[in-house]
Amino acid sequence: MASSMLSTAAVACINRASPAQASMVAPFTGLKSTSAFPTTRKTTTDITSIASNGGRVQCMQVWPPRGKKFYETLSYLPPLTREQLAKEVEYLLRKGWVPCLEFELEHGTVYREYHRSPGYYDGRYWTMWKLPMFGCTDAVQVLQELDEMIKAYPDCYGRIIGFDNVRQVQCISFLAYKPKGAE
């Protein structure tokens, strides 16, 4: 009795599944032949297929490794004016980032002092000036703090950082002050 009920249920399942199987898509059998697409083949003796940017190479320049140090973002440009600094700070404030000021007394660049591999003492970490400026809404406040930092340490390198406190990452960093006589 139980076996007849089971077989009836199994037959009912198979009968119900049949219409669904009829509408199934055929399985993937591979890519079709590409002979339908017209292509042109270059001969192996054709040297024009070798990649070349010879026309552009002459206008590209390399950053000189001696004499000019790369400090931060925008450091390849002439020093930013007060108005340009204010615009950069306004940009980071518009993005909702927290402005921070940092300074370095000896080196404004990444350098290796104690080891050949990168580490804590290679110039990437600068000293923070006071605290991050949470709640700051005006670029003038940031520039006043920059002036205070320069007054306290006239021989320092100073940079402004935009910190995103939601993602907890540094989003922008640029050199705001180089001491007199710096390269």
From Swiss-Prot:
GO terms for cellular component: chloroplast. It is found in: Plastid, Chloroplast. It comes from the Eukaryota. Residues 1-58 form a transit peptide. This is Ribulose bisphosphate carboxylase small subunit, chloroplastic. PANTHER family: RIBULOSE BISPHOSPHATE CARBOXYLASE SMALL CHAIN 1, CHLOROPLASTIC, RIBULOSE BISPHOSPHATE CARBOXYLASE SMALL SUBUNIT, CHLOROPLASTIC 2. InterPro entries: RuBisCO_ssu, RuBisCO_ssu_dom, RuBisCO_ssu_N, RuBisCO_ssu_sf. SUPFAM superfamilies: RuBisCO, small subunit. Heterohexadecamer of 8 large and 8 small subunits. Coiled coil: none annotated. CDD domains: RuBisCO_small. Keywords: Calvin cycle, Carbon dioxide fixation, Chloroplast, Photorespiration, Photosynthesis, Plastid, Transit peptide. HAMAP family: RuBisCO_S_bact (MF_00859). Its main location: plastid. GO terms for biological process: photorespiration; reductive pentose-phosphate cycle. One of its GO terms (molecular function) is ribulose-bisphosphate carboxylase activity. It comes from Hevea brasiliensis (Para rubber tree). Belongs to the RuBisCO small chain family. The gene is RBCS. The basic functional RuBisCO is composed of a large chain homodimer in a 'head-to-tail' conformation. In form I RuBisCO this homodimer is arranged in a barrel-like tetramer with the small subunits forming a tetrameric 'cap' on each end of the 'barrel'. RuBisCO catalyzes two reactions: the carboxylation of D-ribulose 1,5-bisphosphate, the primary event in carbon dioxide fixation, as well as the oxidative fragmentation of the pentose substrate. Both reactions occur simultaneously and in competition at the same active site. Although the small subunit is not catalytic it is essential for maximal activity.
